[in-house]
């Protein structure tokens, strides 16, 4: 579903532009991944530098209305819904959405 994939890309890029550290490079990559038996899927990754990673469980970033402490300023706005929509779309299409972070770098990975 092209519209759903476009919405995922838009939401992830919106999230990255809101919360990336100043002068951060936002990277988007898309690659084909073999799932065996002639089946394939796509892996979309959006990553960027952040001033600080949210403390605790990064996976909570996908919870509806959850906002990490570092993102509560009025400068960034947002309602805490976008990433939960990303995960819902991915799962509705038989995929997944995950997040990883290390050394002021955060990456969101969506597999379809």
Where in this protein do the model-derived segments appear?
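A residue-level detector for a conserved hydrophobic packing site
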Residues: 5-6
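Short helix-loop "hinge" at the ATP-lid/N-box region of the Bergerat-fold HATPase_c
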Residues: 16-17
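Short beta-strand/loop element within the Bergerat-fold HATPase_c
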Residues: 23-40
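Glycine-rich nucleotide-binding loop
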Residues: 41, 52, 80, 102-109
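Short conserved segment of the HATPase_c
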Residues: 53-67
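Short alpha-helical Gxxx[C/S/T] motif in the catalytic ATP-binding
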Residues: 82, 86
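Conserved glycine-rich
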Residues: 94-95
């Amino acid at each position: 579903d092209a519209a759903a994939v476009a919405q995922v890309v838009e939401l992830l890029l919106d999230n990255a532009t809101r919360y990336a550290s100043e002068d951060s490079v936002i990277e988007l990559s898309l690659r084909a991944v073999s799932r065996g038996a002639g089946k394939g899927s796509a892996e979309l990754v959006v990553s960027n530098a952040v001033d600080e990673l949210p403390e605790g469980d990064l996976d909570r970033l996908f919870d509806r209305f959850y906002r990490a402490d570092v993102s509560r300023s009025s400068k960034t706005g947002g309602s805490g819904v976008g990433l939960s929509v990303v995960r819902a779309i991915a799962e509705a299409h038989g995929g997944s959405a995950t997040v990883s972070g290390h050394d002021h770098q955060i990456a969101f990975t969506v597999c379809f």
